[in-house]
Amino acid sequence: LKGNIEDLANHYHALYQEESLADERPENYDEALYWYDEYLESFPEDVETPGIHYQLADLLLENEDFGGAARAYESTAYEYAAHGQAAAAGYAAIYAHREHQKVAVGAQTAMVRSDAVTSTLRFIEAFPTHEHADVVLGAAVDDLYDMDEFELAIENGRKLIADYPRTTPEIRRSAWVVVAHASFDTAAYVDAEDAYMRVLEMTDADDETRQAVVDNLAASIYKQGEQANVMEDYRAAADHFLRIHAVAPGSEIRPAAEYDAGAALMRLEDWTMAAQVLDDFRRTFPDHELNRDATRQIATVYREDGQLARAAAEYE
């Protein structure tokens, strides 16, 4: 009986694939589907059942039932005792999900993407040494960030970096980018700074994205300065703001950071350092919109420091 059912499933599957019988494809598809299902229901524990389940998944994929194929491949990969086709089935499930993404529309799009990510993470856990594990995990990490799943994006981005040291530079850099962005978005600015530094190290000098990386690196440091200001730790705030000069001198936020460093030093009543920082700002960025404010601040610093003549000169 088992052999007869298998023969019938294979027979109708072959007829379905026959180009000369294109007009009969729907009927042959239904027949093949019926007999595959009959086999799975009749012999769920048989040693050959995973292979039959794999063939059913192939049939569904050939008929572009991508969601059904993905589920069938997942069942083949994860619902049986260990077998030789398990890893291939798990990988095929991810492929089917990705094909489904290409044709999904409307609200279905987000669900299909989520299914692809879930399938990928399951695959990585079950088959971490698969030859394409790093590639599919990299795609899932990108998706997790796009889905605003920041903590999972960080966790799996770091997993990719740590567990797959031989992955391509492109995949490694992309993982660090996700870790950096997601850390920034979750206010983990120290981690973001470290990750952006890693990205910068992997970015060529003539890469058109380099300036954005520099700006993001500077922003992660600037945010640490803002946090220190909120905590009224003005010395730490000034130090963070001034670090941008050394770490990201070409960043867009550097002028504002140096001005804010002067303001933090004024709160500390460190008049000498405040005057130096603000004067450096004024000379380095003579056309900046905060230049006039810097002059007023310098005058205030001199006045508070008892240097009235210098204060008066600044007011002039």
Language-model segments: which ranges?
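Acidic, polar-rich low-complexity tracts and alpha-helical solenoid repeat scaffolds
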Residues: 1-316
